[in-house]
Regions:
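Sec/Tat signal peptide C-region and signal peptidase I cleavage site
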Residues: 20-26
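Compact alpha-helical subdomains of small soluble proteins
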Residues: 69-152
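Bacterial N-terminal signal peptides that target proteins for export
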Residues: 2-11
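The N-terminal extracellular segments of secreted preproproteins, especially immediately downstream
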Residues: 11-12, 34, 110
């Protein structure tokens, strides 16, 4: 009788752990989407400055882009794909529009650190892929700058 009860208890514990793990996975996707949205919001004014010719923001924009891409890479490795990722990102952007600026700044700082840590923990190939993609993105943004020609 106790063996049967022990098996039931073990089965309940396993089911509970599996449900908790599934819930944690969903939460982590939401967290990653929130981070990507926060980093994108932080990067947008820098990208605008770079497009207008201000090269002084290029290094900072590259770091933000690398952090965002690293977080996207982890979400992809965990099975998140485009349709669901886009939906989570849209939701995160909407939520962040109503966040007080200090809370958004804190989220952005935490997410940048998290992205940097993900990149530091990545293997050489993963780091290469993320940094190369980020460099290409920032280069494309910089190339959108059209120098102002003066009439002389």
């Amino acid at each position: 009788m106790t063996f049967y009860r022990d098996r039931q208890t073990l089965a309940c514990c396993l089911i509970s752990m599996m449900a908790t793990t599934a819930l944690a996975a969903d939460t982590s996707h939401e967290h990653r989407a929130a981070c990507v949205a926060a980093l994108t919001t932080q990067a947008e004014p820098l990208a605008a400055r770079l497009k207008s010719g201000d090269r002084s923001v290029q290094a900072e924009l590259l770091k933000l882009t690398e952090s965002g891409f690293a977080i996207i890479g982890i979400a992809y490795q965990d099975g998140l794909r485009k349709p669901q990722a886009d939906q989570l990102l849209d939701t995160a952007k909407k939520v962040q529009k109503s966040m007080p600026p200090p809370a958004l700044s804190q989220l952005q700082a935490r997410c940048q650190i998290e992205g940097e840590q993900v990149l530091a923990d990545a293997n050489a190939l993963e780091r290469f892929l993320v940094t190369s993609a980020a460099e290409r993105r920032v280069k494309r943004i910089a190339e959108k700058h059209k120098p102002v020609r003066d009439g002389s």
